[in-house]
């Protein structure tokens, strides 16, 4: 019972700090250290400069300041391990521990950074006294962005990896131009504290992720992929273990009455589509990242744009996500490609795409529905002039003339297909 109380108390403190981290004062920084279980002490360096030292098992941070932290002079980080190249700088070469304390009104960014360092410290498998290291998460975090960028580039996917943006620790994936943020790759506590987390490194020659030593591991953490928006993923492509959205909404295709009069939609979905944005990945499954990113592109470039083009211009009430009145998927089911074996890059699996930011599936779901009287007017449409569209989660047909396939076509072909559909609907 006491453990549960302590966990609840810690959660309440964390939420309070996230909500209102406090202004940048020396007492507030010291209190923040106390809530995170860190030691702190102040030394007078000279008549005008003081130093606040913050220490944990591995991390030591020295903050030099003047006048009770009115002016931050410098922030330095030292690790009590053999790794001395930990990256706490942004792409401009700025020290983010310093920038998260300088010219800011509150401790929000610094609290995030300090909490992240405590996380890496707590879950690194390092014996300081003997010098033996099984898994140094400070090194892993430093190396991860380049490994991800090399892997994505080798898979010929148009994405850019960035690190330590906005004065906070973190790894993000952007579109090819580095303008639109697609997702973050985070390290978080796992629901199962006994779950092993093995170190996998990317071999650019073999173009694969390798676990070079079974001893290179820790416990109780996961990689987490977090998209910036909800994406419709086929339910049968995902195992329950990786899903973090507890009760995801189902995306239902619109009724025929919601579509333009010139469109006839045939539903060939073999799986429910779930609107999700977060996935818990064991490190041995990091090879799934290109599949997530490719599906994101398919979702954005093809699925969203097709629905945007075929939905009636005069829709007036919202398209429901419930089962009532919508065309139901056929009962054919695929087995999950993630269950009971390591995934292959040739498998069809859960993914996502980039681009066309102005129209999301959520926006489509929020579109209005035409009235019954308007629906009656459609009965007079010449059926022979309707454009037959067959939609499956992995392919779309426009009659017998055009096909767009997730598996068999590249991104250029997807865009050409959308251009063709636009020309037919003008």
Swiss-Prot record:
The keyword Transmembrane does not apply. Keywords: Activator, Nucleus, Transcription, Transcription regulation. Residues 319-349 are annotated as: Disordered. GO terms for cellular component: mediator complex. Residues 336-347 have a biased composition (Polar residues). Component of the Mediator complex. Belongs to the Mediator complex subunit 1 family. Pfam families: Med1 (PF10744). It comes from the Eukaryota. This is Mediator of RNA polymerase II transcription subunit 1. GO terms for molecular function: transcription coregulator activity. It is found in: Nucleus. Component of the Mediator complex, a coactivator involved in the regulated transcription of nearly all RNA polymerase II-dependent genes. Mediator functions as a bridge to convey information from gene-specific regulatory proteins to the basal RNA polymerase II transcription machinery. Mediator is recruited to promoters by direct interactions with regulatory proteins and serves as a scaffold for the assembly of a functional preinitiation complex with RNA polymerase II and the general transcription factors. InterPro entries: Mediator_Med1. It comes from Kluyveromyces lactis (strain ATCC 8585 / CBS 2359 / DSM 70799 / NBRC 1267 / NRRL Y-1140 / WM37) (Yeast). GO terms for biological process: positive regulation of transcription by RNA polymerase II. The keyword Nucleotide-binding does not apply.
